[in-house]
Amino acid sequence: MVIVTRIRREVLTLPAAELGPDNPLPPLRPLEEIHHVDERDREDLPRDMARQLGYEPLRSLLPVRVRDGYGRARTPRDVDALVIENDRLRATVLPGLGGRIASLVHLPTGRELLYRNPVFQPADLALNGAWYAGGIEWNIGATGHTTLSCAPLHAARVPAPDGGEMLRLWEWERLRDLPFQVDLWLPDGSDFLYAGVRVRNPHEHPVPVYWWSNTAVPEDRRVVVPAEEAWEFGYERRLRRAPVPAHDAQQPYPADWFYDIPDGRRRWIAAFDADGHGLVQTSTDELRGRKQFVWGAGPGGRRWQEWLCGTGTGGYREIQAGLARTQLEHVRLDAESEVSWLEAYGPLSAAPQSVENELELALPRAEFDAAHAAWKPYADTEPGELLATGSGWGALEVLRADWKLPGTPFAESTLTEEQAPWRELLRTGTLPEPRRVRPPGPTLVAPHWRDMLETAPATPHTEYHLGVAQWHAGDRAQAVRSWERALPLAPSLWPLLRCLAVADQEYGHHERAAERYADAFDDLCRERRDDGEAWTAACAALGRETVEALLRVRRVADARAVWETLLPATRERGRFRLLEAELLLVEGRRTAARAVFDAGFEVADLREGSEAIGRLWARLADEPLPARYDFGMRPQSL
């Protein structure tokens, strides 16, 4: 048998915005989660669903940082890609951007099977901020788009079960501290791309697991799935049963439909054009859930599509597959165990009523289940040629625990400057002081790292990180004590003062929080060494929080003073133009505030579901919100 699968490098050039630096301030506040069902609404749900809805929901982004440094100025940029192809399919993978499959082309017909976004435009939809639309994405961690959406993954060539080659992607997911892998290959003579996925729990305790594979397809596609009912989750933020099909192109607001596929039925979902051609996704039974997401036909949904993909590019909808029935649930993964499954993506032409029969002809279920079993031993095969490098966090965890994770090596050579102080803490029991004055690096917060911080010499730098870890653990009083202990001897006060200000706000002490924020910003301005990326990001992040805290307690003149201290380039960013409009309004300068809107601005990091622009506009004007600012995801009456 001649194996014709090829894996090669490619460079894509497309209009792309810069990702920019991460926000250097630790994310201490609770998550603003729109995908949440109230306790009282769970009583009418199936018992297993209600239990998993309440099982270990994510409460903090730590140790991950927020990615909000991107803008909206797009220029032609090169993006590294890996292409896996045979004579039937060509898949284009972006290892530096979450391992996204950006394109899947059926070569005999030339059809693009996915929605291929013509631009790279991050927006605030991932758990930690930056996310982009299009293709097939791998979501792991917790309800929402993964924190790895715009992060690099490790990638390498690996032998495939049929004697050809696989492209392996792997990384360490930091919210739950779990290693995972995605093996992509094209079986000889097949029209399907296979994706073997494995998530491992190396810990001595159970861990909540979340996985959803999301596929963007053109918006005009008709979705077909083997279910009669679905669980609908819309702008009311309630789960309710709905018949299938219960949705059409006139759905006004964004909505999710989680399909209730009967036990024993094959797991699949498909999307077809008007001529009956399209994409089908199927999996082994481990990947239980299927879902459709639409932005809706209302002005807010249309605006979001333009925001993510540009004007005139056509919209998209998503078909998805996950471990649980809904994305609001997390599944228990027992100690020292793993879960794996096999997915397939490929072309299918069929009438809606004959999809399952056509799928069985194209990819028999028994044959596919056997392919999963045949792949499992290959999941442990050590990678060959490395094609891309991810983060060093997995290497640090493997170094700490001496875990053996065959198939997904986390080599010490991947450790970088970010991991260096934590490696030193692991080796010597001491967290080293920074060699130069700069904003603090990220904090590790897992129990084993917190224990090491508690026994390390109590320097101000260590106390800062210990406080962040204690805050994450829910020990807020002890976190405050750690930060306060560090203040008298700390060479850099602003990181500690900012943490204490957040604590004050959480306890309702807003006057004291504003004072601490003002002191923190003054200290940062004195300490700032240059206008480089790190210091600029710190000043912008802390400046924004400080202005907001001062406005909250009506210290308007002080808020204006902070605003005027910000760099001109920072003040021109859309987020700060919105803040300026609010500042002008509370100063009594309504006409000037309205002029900010009339001049136009774009809040690059506008959060999905945020109504901040609309609320401020309502305070300024009686007219309807201009279309360019309308990102509404629910009726204004709610």
Model-derived features: positions:
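Acidic, contiguous internal or C-terminal segments within carbohydrate-active enzymes
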Residues: D80, E85, A91-T109, L169-R221, ...
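Extended, loop-rich substrate-binding clefts of extracytoplasmic carbohydrate-active enzymes
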Residues: M1, E43-E85, I136-S190, D220-R222, ...
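Start-of-helix register in tetratricopeptide repeats
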Residues: H461, P495, A534-A541, R575
